[in-house]
Amino acid sequence: MKDHEYHALTDAFFQYVEDTVDAGYPDIDCERAGGVLTLSFENKTKVIINKQEPLHQIWVATRENGFHFELQGETWIDNRFGHELKALLTKACTTQAGESVVFP
């Protein structure tokens, strides 16, 4: 994958996360700064999603663990645990928000 393709894919994913949060979860604050997207919850916990351009990965830090996602076909898959990115965000955000959060 070329760098410009990676940036287009990650930018689109970041926008998808922002749009999902803004449309349905007013108690979650979403802030993007450069290649980092931070989701902040009322209980002061955070989920941090960031680009790792040299590796063409997306890294996610949650209260539980850190995850490194690589694009496999059209799906971002964690290279250690095999989690799909949207499913991992759904689980982590639901846990940290204390209410159902879904990234379809």
Curated annotation (Swiss-Prot):
Q: What gene does this protein come from?
A: cyaY
Q: Which SUPFAM superfamilies match?
A: Frataxin/Nqo15-like (SSF55387)
- Similarity comment: Belongs to the frataxin family.
Please give the InterPro entries that the UniProt record associates with this protein.
CyaY, Frataxin/CyaY, Frataxin/CyaY_sf, Frataxin_CS
Which GO terms of the molecular function aspect are on file? Answer: ferric iron binding; ferrous iron binding
- Metal-binding is among the record's keywords: yes
Its protein name is Iron-sulfur cluster assembly protein CyaY
Question: Which classification does the entry list for the species?
Answer: Bacteria, Pseudomonadati, Pseudomonadota, Gammaproteobacteria, Aeromonadales
- CDD domains noted in UniProt: Frataxin (cd00503)
GO BP term, pick one: iron-sulfur cluster assembly
Q: Thylakoid among the record's keywords?
A: no
Its function, per the record, reads: Involved in iron-sulfur (Fe-S) cluster assembly. May act as a regulator of Fe-S biogenesis.
* A GO cellular-component term linked to this record: cytosol
